[in-house]
From Swiss-Prot:
InterPro entries: Aldolase_TIM (IPR013785), Coproporphyrinogen-III_oxidase (IPR034505), Elp3/MiaA/NifB-like_rSAM (IPR006638), HemN_C (IPR010723), HemW-like (IPR004559), rSAM (IPR007197). GO terms for biological process: porphyrin-containing compound biosynthetic process. It comes from the Bacteria. Gene3D superfamilies: Aldolase class I (3.20.20.70). S-adenosyl-L-methionine 2 binds at residues 67-68, 126, 138, 162. Might carry two S-adenosyl-L-methionine binding sites with only one binding to the iron-sulfur cluster. Its main location: cytoplasm. It is found in: Cytoplasm. This is Heme chaperone HemW. PROSITE patterns: RADICAL_SAM. One of its GO terms (cellular component) is cytoplasm.
Length: 376
């Protein structure tokens, strides 16, 4: 019998306080025209439509993302979590995360989130520098960011801080100061990533004064050194965690696990008992979604595409790639890719061991070139 991978649940909440110029996630600024109660009801109906694909499988993690899901009333989170638990099996040890904007953090409401089952919070600080916050169009200042982090510490030990580098006119000193502020509050996890300008975003067409490649490299080297000295282990390209506090939900993504995606524009990946992999994309048109048209697209992943999709995720992690896991997650014998593996080894991107493949420093540095081998 084919061994199914672990499975998670992603819930998309599409509204925001303000759409930032660099953001390419699907969201609406005006919350009022999407009734909160009705949207939660449709989320649950969307979930019900997917139940036939997962049968009785146990959910190992839940991630409530957006948008800004922390705009939800605590009563809405309570209802949503209660009703989800009626419909699916959730592990007693499941990690349940909600993303939050610092300006939405209210002690009582977030404490009630915790009472409803949320056991991990992810706070999108981005930077503690008020001038830089203005430049990236965030709606709060340094003082408000600090107050938010201080509040979340009172509510829950397990929390992540999102911090960015490579911001407009940002210096190395600015970068290290941000990280010093972050570790001061002892988060269990820090997501530290470079600002990237995605097509079809306002920042993409603006001529922003971003740090050059040499300065970005210095920021990365010095920042990683500081985080390591502060007790945070790098386990993924932009993820750093205290011991045993890696984000389980994201680890499942990167290990090519399964996940249901519910809500506007949510994506899903669900493996079937015969080894077939189904990809789902939910409707991003809010009016269609609120009229019950949840599923936009569903397709099977072709055999030839599975290796690329697997490696695109697993190579983000700083760990060896088990050959056994490749076969288990793709339902493909490793001999199917032996010529491509050979090419990657010849180019110095991979090392081949008896039970695993390991990316070299060169492979991590030129990850896109490594992945292209499996795309050709």
């Amino acid at each position: 019998m084919f061994k199914l991978p672990p499975i998670s649940l992603y819930i998309h909440i599409p509204w925001c306080i303000k759409k930032c110029g660099y953001c390419d996630f699907y969201s609406y600024v005006n919350k009022s025209f999407i009734p909160e109660k009705e949207y939660i009801d449709h989320l649950l109906k969307d979930l019900e439509k997917d139940l036939s694909l997962i049968k009785e499988r146990e959910i190992n993690s839940i991630f409530i993302g957006g948008g800004t899901p922390s705009l939800l009333k605590s009563s809405s989170i309570k209802k949503m979590m209660r009703e989800i638990k009626k419909r699916i099996n959730i592990s007693n040890t499941a990690e349940i995360t909600i993303e939050a904007n610092p300006t939405t953090l209210e002690y009582k409401r977030f404490f009630n989130y915790k009472k409803s089952g949320i056991n991990r919070f992810s706070i999108g600080v981005q930077t503690f520098n008020s001038d830089l916050l203005k430049k990236i169009e965030r709606t709060y200042n340094k003082r408000e960011a600090i107050l938010a982090v201080e509040e979340i510490k009172k509510i829950n030990k397990n929390f992540n801080l999102d911090i960015m580098y490579g911001l407009p006119n940002q210096s190395l000193k600015d970068v290290l100061l941000d990280l010093q502020y972050a570790v001061k509050y002892n988060p269990t996890h820090i997501s530290w990533y470079q600002l990237t300008l995605e097509p079809n975003t306002p920042f993409y067409v603006k001529k922003l004064n971003l740090p050059n490649e040499n300065n970005i490299f210095k920021m990365l080297v010095e920042g990683e050194k500081f985080l390591k000295q502060s007790g945070y282990k790098k386990y993924e390209i932009s993820s750093y965690a205290k011991l045993n506090y890696e984000c389980q939900h994201n680890l499942n993504y990167w290990n090519f696990g399964d996940y249901i995606g519910i809500g506007c524009s949510a994506h899903g990946k669900i493996t079937q008992i015969n080894g077939d992999i189904i990809r789902t994309i939910k409707n991003k048109n809010i009016n269609d979604f609120m009229n019950g048209k949840y599923l936009k697209h569903k397709n099977f992943v072709l055999k030839k595409d599975k290796p690329f999709e697997y490696f695109m995720n697993i190579f983000r992690l700083y760990k060896p790639v088990l050959k056994r896991q490749f076969e288990e997650r793709t339902n493909i014998n490793q001999n199917y890719i032996k010529e491509k593996i050979k090419k990657a080894i010849e180019k110095g991107y991979l090392k081949n061991k008896i039970d695993f493949w390991d990316t070299t420093k060169k492979g991590k540095m030129f990850l896109n070139s490594l992945l292209k081998i499996f795309l050709d």
